[in-house]
Amino acid sequence: MGLIRKSHKQTQALAIKKIIKKCSSFGKNNDDSGLPNDVPKGHFVVYVGERRNRYIVPISCLDHPTFQDLLQRSEEEFGFNHDMGIIIPCQEVDFLSFFSMIA
């Protein structure tokens, strides 16, 4: 009987799914389901830059290799086991440039 290990990407994806629902609503009004009113279905929130500005990002970005790299850097720098939301460790101008290329 062999053990099947989850890959790092699978583990990271599960962690991200958990915190997307848990952390995307800081400081915002929620509906009856607990989801933030201003975040459309199929999107999640990240916080970017020194000022931790809030951005709503489509879930489809999770498949992009550059975004996966940003998430890995976020996990290494901040971890995902906290109540602060997903913090992207890059300058806001760089994030906006990246996002404009893939959106």
UniProtKB/Swiss-Prot annotation:
GO terms for biological process: auxin-activated signaling pathway. InterPro entries: SAUR_fam. The keyword Cell membrane does not apply. Keywords: Auxin signaling pathway, Growth regulation. It comes from the Eukaryota. Belongs to the ARG7 family. SAUR50 is more highly expressed on the east side of solar tracking sunflower stems during the day, while an IAA19-like gene is more highly expressed on the west side at night. Effector of hormonal and environmental signals in plant growth. Involved in heliotropism. This is Auxin-responsive protein SAUR50. It comes from Helianthus annuus (Common sunflower).
